[in-house]
Regions:
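Short, surface-exposed ligand- or partner-binding patches at beta-edge/loop junctions that are enriched
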Residues: 73
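Rhodanese-like catalytic fold shared by cysteine-dependent sulfurtransferases
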Residues: 1-27, 35-69, 78-116
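Conserved beta/loop motifs at nucleotide-recognition and modification sites
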Residues: 30
């Protein structure tokens, strides 16, 4: 079940919760790593928006989300938390936003689908 810290403007989900939300069609996932990291391995179906582009890409993220929840993922969960904060600051706070804890490392370790 997603958790929320009242000090943060976003929630947190495990990779298992993220996969369930994606499988149920309730969420989309945005990978905020750099293109070279993304090219090595990424969760299936994610959209690449490097963390330093999140603020300028909010309209594209909103379009990609289509009203669904937005899950931010990075390598381990640090940059994706920052990306969620940036997204809120840039006006995306009206959508449910989540940081995927453990990031791509945990996604791969869990054996969840990767690639395009």
């Amino acid at each position: 079940m997603p958790t929320r810290d009242p000090r943060e403007p976003f929630g947190r989900v495990t990779v298992a919760e993220a996969k369930q939300l994606l499988d149920e069609g309730k969420a989309v996932m945005v990978d905020v790593r750099e293109p070279n990291e993304y090219a090595e391995v990424h969760a299936k179906g994610v959209r690449l928006v490097p963390v330093n582009h999140v603020i300028t890409e909010v309209p594209q993220i909103r379009d990609f989300a289509g009203g669904k929840e937005v899950l931010f993922i990075c390598r381990s969960g640090q940059r994706s938390a920052l990306a969620a904060e940036y997204a809120v600051a840039a006006g995306l706070g009206d959508l449910p936003l989540y940081n995927v804890e453990g990031g791509t490392l945990a996604w791969v370790e869990a054996g969840f689908p990767t690639g395009d």
